[in-house]
Design a protein with these regions (language model features):
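Bacterial Sec-dependent N-terminal signal peptides
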Residues: 1-22
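Low-complexity, acidic/polar, glycine-enriched regions of mature
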Residues: 20-183
Length: 183
């Protein structure tokens, strides 16, 4: 009987420890920017879900494509219906690991890191290494940075009629302020 209680207590403590090691944000920010000959295109999404396991440095991100907001409604419509096909591919995801996360000290200092993993956009999976800056404190894990994506890598077709309006290389910036996850 004592063995059963010991197992149950160990299981419960393990779950409590794991819960304390996860950091989450539901309002992370991702922006993409396309600089082209005819016009610049910028879209913001402030409803990005991101979680970090502080024990392992594993990170997962989920972005709802329809949550990107554009300056012009027509740009948003074309983005969702014609390019990323949001009804067919409603989200973009990233699953990876912050390299050498365990060596990042809990301070208020910004540390340069690399995040390695797989990004999925438009149903296409690509391995990627993203440079980022991280600030790790007792209360939060802030991860921010920028990188470039190529539209062609994700099988996103741009009609030749508007090819001059959209850059082939898209600049992506992100800013996630993770707080301890509490169930």
């Amino acid at each position: 009987m004592k063995t059963i209680y010991t197992i149950i207590i160990c299981f419960l403590l393990a779950n409590v420890t794991n819960a304390q090691e996860r950091y989450l944000t539901k309002n992370g920010a991702v922006t993409f920017f396309s600089s082209a000959v005819v016009e610049d295109i910028k879209a913001d999404n402030n409803q990005v879900l991101s979680i970090i396991d502080a024990g392992s440095g594993k990170m997962a991100i989920k972005i709802l494509m329809k949550s990107f907001m554009f300056k012009k409604a027509l740009m948003q419509e074309h983005f969702n219906e014609n390019y990323v096909e949001s009804d067919k591919f409603p989200k973009a995801t990233f699953k990876g690991t912050i390299v050498d996360f365990e060596s990042i000290k809990i301070t208020n200092l910004e540390t340069k890191v690399e995040v390695k993993g797989v990004i999925t956009i438009h149903g296409i999976n690509k391995e990627i290494v993203i440079p980022a800056n991280i600030i790790r404190t007792e209360e939060s894990i802030l991860v921010k940075g920028e990188f470039n994506l190529f539209v062609a890598d994700y099988n996103i077709k741009i009609p030749s009629v508007v090819a001059k309006n959209i850059a082939k290389k898209i600049k992506v910036t992100f800013d996630f302020n993770h707080k301890p996850y509490k169930k």
